[in-house]
């Protein structure tokens, strides 16, 4: 079967949130045609104006066409949804917009279609709305036809693309366009938000230019809209030519924190990378989702690092992508990067740290092994060969192998099709180095898996590269080994354990990050003692590189959350030592590091929080990077007396960046009933559905109120579950929430979920419980 085009007319009733549609589909088919249609009433199917029979099935219709080439017409009607997928309503203030979210399999909730990424087609969309409404789609407006107090907006035809990339937005918008070159780049917001659009507009222009140059393929559409949606389940979505974002992932200005501006840059870069990897070339089926997400993640860091070198974005990469992926992939509940997807309901479960962070980290490892030029040459060849069509992982390996002459296919087979990653133990005997690999498991177990590992090793100052394809390998350098280090620049996706830390050579920031990250998770796996771990930490009490400092601070803060009596002393000692170093530094990464240390201290030290809370009276003049910490401190030290003040400030903020600041503070109170009151704001709509994703993990990380939060979750778990139904996100929320929330009550949590199973979140619950049991060993 092949589909040539969908010609879609939508008559939209914005007031009553419903619509009717007439759709003409040109295709050729050899047998029965099945159109996916969920929550849509199909009223007729016609050929040449004549009604033909069709059968309604659950979430689809079947049309007995036999061998057919031509055009069919489908008439249908449907209501706008409220569950953040398909075509849905996104409220803001006293108004709303209508937006769409079709990835992975939700286009069927808007129009009858073959909702499968392999069946690409051109789309021609026309929408009839009231005169005062604006409409956005993937392409520019071709013409507008007035009809009394209504109008029909006809959009230009799209290139061939998958159904999940179609977009429709309806409402009242403000726009900020850059017409300086092709394509036109615009930021679109709901009324009153456009003042924070200049920075994202500039990023959009810069990243499109970067990708056109890197990929050697011009951006193929006339325009690129970056659309801020006030209620959005995910971070962003790469609809071709009409990218949607939650407001905190798109909007920023000079008053924004560096963390906010960096996030905006990264998310824009990620979604724009998809315009080539995902939109121009699309995976054949969701098994290869990682082809889209891993590449967009990897390329976004490369793009940001090029545009903003002062942000050291490869450092951010190991902090934000590699570290999280290595944790999740060391659990028993994980999956290969190339995950088998047989049912559409399984698709949402693989939008996770493996498909994004691990896949991107493997690409970084492969680029380091091939060299940047050969890697880029292979990518360009792949895009040229498969543009406007679909591809599989092996197609990419072949392109990279042909460009480099290296066995990329063999290496990727090892890393993509099996889960997990290795621990490499390094020992020295005279002139010999012994490398031993075994799969690293966070609970201390292992199995017989081996990996084909591109190893970088420096011995006595001399760099060596090799492929380790066996369990044990011995290297004789012919002279006594005085110093060495393995995994240069933390480019490899593996952990390293040294038999003798005293002979480890001098390390850069990335390598120090790798060392402290590896030793923390070796501690959790009971493969090093706390004394060995503490020795590594104490060697860095006066460390001046932000990467190991940020990592150690996060580790010690985590240990504080697990057991403040046991680990609080070391955590406070490290933070106080580091605060002195970073307090007066003014470069961007130093301010970010200092802010991270200060936020941790607010939750660890009541006196510190009380002192910092005094800054709240002059919040407008506080460093934007410290505002989160100041508001948290005001809440944490003020207690019940200031709760209503913080809540009112949360409710009255215009921009989501500030709303998130106050929401975080509302979950930082030391009093359990106040935090629970905040969680219950989600019942009234005070907290958006999209933010349920955030509030439960945040509440679980408040060590003073966990008992109250657990009681609330047991009582009201059906509310967040129903709010996020269909998005596939609730499992991830529980995976992130249970490890800390369940501390001290492992059996109770286990019993609760055995009595109240949540099938769509089963994997996330199992991951969370596995991590909870590992953490409990630290108590």
Where are these regions (language model features)?
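Non-catalytic accessory/interaction domains
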Residues: 126-129, 134, 145, 151, ...
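General secondary-structure propensity
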Residues: 7-12, 282, 643-649
